[in-house]
């Protein structure tokens, strides 16, 4: 039966009594970059509501004569046939055995570096190997070799940087920039002041007039390094501005080649929207087209073959996981929820692009399921449900008992059970990985999340516009970042004891910043479409009310500056030295932020997933790399 075909009126006598797990409000701490709230009266109704509601809004009248709004989203792009008929031969034993042999051969290449590389190139060669195995997506096999190589490089690091080799007389920008980018990501403390030594007498970066390939690559690595900036590092901002301008001008001069494509990819995706598996797919093409690399010794041939094979072998794992996800989607009754977006395959793809180690199946599937649930709830609270129905649903979730569905309208019953069953199942998976029961902890997160939705539903129903600060504090919770990350993260083979979890999850600054980025970036991409659907409240509208006379362009500029600053703070939270939390424990939450950020890079890629998001699915999930 279609879940929205029967919508009986809610009985006034039915009351879902509940006891929340915690009396705490779980209010996120104030965000450090909120604007000054002006001392002016707040309008209770939006002055733009009448005009925005007159725009195209999809509505339907249910069987109980309730007028309901829907988003008019496009349908699911990946039906059962697309998934079920995926075929790949790369799951066969012969390919895996070939991969194991290649791994051993690449290990031999790492080992031979100390013998083959001269003292005038030993540093850059080690950095080259580390950088390439990471960009090709095969670094998980060489953790010990990478550490040994970086230990060696760091032992020669100075306040002025490094040269190409240990016997080099002068420091080298390419070696220093590549080292400066790579070392912090592995926990080695280095100062941005090292880049000051590559400026001229008046404190400006300068380019070499010869513009050789090495000069250009120096600028590529300087730009890549500049993106891992911390707050207050002016030299990093200068390096980014200078190298970005240089590379854009270079693209206009050089012919189409592997180097030009590499520059284009780096400028297009940077770091914070360059998902590791997506980067690997793009870099495989760049690496394979580089004639200089292919004329080199066996290093490049082995690296490239292993990267291609690993990429395709993982697709055989993805096929099995997609079949499992499709069964869950059907069994949960999702196809009958016709008012919502169905983007479970897209969410799975994002998870696969940030965690493609085979053992992290639980994370990938959990993330896709959690995000699908969040999307259903988002559309139900923002559009389809009435305020009274949503109050009943929120109360029923806090009871956490299937009998609570007796109080709910018919269309909500299946949604409730999808949430209930999936959260319980993910908690069981997390208990296996973490060795303790985390269900109550997860329930608290979902309760707070729905409370934030309930607040927004009331704002929409009344037309009330909150202050910017009020909206952002609630919006960081309703962004869904925390509940999308928490349980999938706990299924991984990374220990998250309570003292570590509190530094990664709520109430940590890492969590607060990640949620802020998702809310701010999401609003800059979605506010016009949301307003057309009658959802007036956004960071943009609240900023404009707080600042009379400000235009939408002013608001967008302000938010973009905020986002840039928050990204730098997030970099610091991930990489700050002397942290009690390993980078590996923080990295998955950081990478989830990158995944969401990618989805909003060009547009709302979750509502309109038929362009860039579809391309991501095709390129990383469905299309193998030609060997």
Swiss-Prot record:
The keyword Transit peptide is annotated on this UniProt entry: yes
User: Does Plastid show up as a keyword for this record?
Assistant: yes
Q: Where are the transmembrane segments?
A: none
According to the UniProt record, which cysteines are disulfide-bonded? none
Keyword terms of this UniProt record: Chloroplast, Lyase, Magnesium, Metal-binding, Plastid, Transit peptide
What's the Enzyme Commission number for this chain?
Answer: 4.2.3.-
- Gene3D superfamilies from the UniProt entry: Farnesyl Diphosphate Synthase, Terpene synthase, N-terminal domain
List locations, semicolon-separated. Answer: Plastid, Chloroplast
What pathway or pathways are given for this protein in its record? Terpene metabolism; oleoresin biosynthesis; Secondary metabolite biosynthesis; terpenoid biosynthesis
Cofactors needed by this protein, per the record, are: Mg(2+); Mn(2+)
Domain of life of the organism encoding this protein: Eukaryota
A Pfam family that the UniProt record links to this protein:
Terpene_synth_C
Q: How many cofactors are bound and how?
A: Binds 3 Mg(2+) or Mn(2+) ions per subunit.
- Residues that hold Mg(2+) 3 according to the record: 530
Interval spanned by the transit peptide: 1-50
Which GO cellular component does the record give, naming just one? chloroplast
Record's domain comment? The Asp-Asp-Xaa-Xaa-Asp/Glu (DDXXD/E) motif is important for the catalytic activity, presumably through binding to Mg(2+).
This chain's function reads: Monoterpene synthase (TPS) involved in the biosynthesis of monoterpene natural products included in conifer oleoresin secretions and volatile emissions; these compounds contribute to biotic and abiotic stress defense against herbivores and pathogens.
Protein's recorded name? Monoterpene synthase like 1, chloroplastic
State the encoding gene: TPS-mono1
């Amino acid at each position: 039966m279609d879940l929205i075909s029967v919508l009986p009126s809610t009985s006034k006598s039915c009351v879902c009594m509940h006891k929340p797990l915690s009396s705490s409000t779980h209010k996120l701490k104030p965000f450090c970059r909120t604007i000054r709230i002006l001392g002016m009266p707040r309008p209770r109704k939006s002055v733009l509501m009448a005009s925005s509601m007159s725009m195209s809004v999809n509505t339907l009248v249910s069987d109980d004569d309730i007028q309901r709004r829907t988003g008019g989203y496009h349908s699911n792009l990946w039906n059962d046939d697309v998934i079920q008929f995926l075929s790949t031969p790369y799951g066969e034993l012969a390919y895996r055995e070939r991969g194991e042999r290649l791994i051993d051969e690449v290990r031999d290449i790492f080992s031979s570096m100390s013998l083959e590389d001269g003292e005038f190139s030993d540093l850059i060669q080690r950095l080259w190997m580390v950088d390439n195995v990471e960009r090709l997506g095969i670094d998980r096999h060489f953790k010990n070799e990478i550490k040994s190589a970086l230990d060696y490089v760091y032992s020669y690091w100075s306040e002025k940087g490094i040269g190409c080799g240990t016997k080099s007389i002068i420091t080298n920008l390419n070696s220093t920039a590549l080292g400066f980018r790579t070392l912090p990501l592995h926990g080695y403390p280095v100062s941005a002041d090292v880049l000051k030594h590559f400026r001229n007498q008046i404190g400006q970066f300068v380019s070499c007039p010869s513009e050789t390939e090495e000069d250009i690559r120096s600028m590529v690595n300087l730009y890549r390094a500049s993106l891992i900036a911390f707050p207050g590092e002016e030299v990093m901002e200068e390096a980014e501005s200078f190298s970005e301008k240089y590379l854009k001008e270079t693209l206009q001069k050089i012919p189409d080649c592997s180097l030009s494509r590499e520059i284009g990819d780096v400028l297009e995706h940077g770091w914070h929207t360059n998902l590791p598996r997506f980067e690997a797919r793009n870099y495989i093409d760049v690496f394979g087209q580089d004639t200089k690399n292919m004329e080199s010794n066996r290093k490049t041939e082995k690296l490239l073959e292993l990267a291609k094979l690993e990429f395709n072998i993982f697709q055989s794992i993805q096929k099995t996981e997609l079949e499992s996800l499709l069964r869950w989607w059907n069994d949960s009754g999702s196809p009958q929820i016709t008012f919502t977006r169905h983007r479970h395959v897209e969410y799975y793809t994002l998870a696969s692009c940030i965690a493609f180690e085979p053992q992290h199946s639980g994370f990938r599937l959990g993330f896709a399921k959690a995000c699908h649930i969040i999307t259903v709830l988002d559309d139900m609270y923002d559009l389809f449900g009435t305020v009274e129905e949503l109050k009943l649903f929120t109360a029923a979730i806090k009871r956490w008992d299937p009998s609570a569905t007796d109080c709910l309208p018919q269309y909500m019953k299946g949604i409730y059970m999808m949430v209930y069953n999936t959260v319980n199942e993910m908690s069981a998976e997390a208990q296996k990985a973490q060795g303790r029961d985390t269900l109550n902890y997860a329930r608290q997160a979902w309760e707070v999340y729905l409370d934030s939705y309930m607040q927004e539903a009331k704002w929409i129903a009344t037309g009330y516009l909150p202050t910017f600060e009020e909206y952002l504090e609630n919006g960081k919770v309703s962004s869904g970042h925390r509940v999308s990350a928490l349980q999938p993260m706990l299924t991984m083979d990374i220990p998250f004891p309570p003292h570590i979890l509190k530094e990664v999850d709520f109430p940590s600054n890492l969590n607060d910043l990640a949620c802020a980025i998702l809310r701010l970036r999401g609003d800059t991409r979605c506010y016009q479409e949301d307003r057309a659907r009658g959802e007036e409240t956004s960071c943009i509208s609240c900023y404009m009310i707080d600042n009379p006379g400000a235009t939408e362009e002013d608001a967008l500029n302000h938010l973009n500056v905020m986002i840039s600053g928050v990204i730098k703070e997030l970099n610091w939270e991930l990489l700050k030295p002397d942290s009690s939390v390993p980078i590996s424990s923080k990295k998955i939450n950081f990478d989830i932020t990158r995944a969401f950020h990618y989805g909003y890079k060009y547009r709302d890629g979750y509502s309109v997933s038929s362009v860039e998001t579809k391309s991501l699915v095709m390129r990383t999930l469905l299309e193998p790399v030609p060997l």
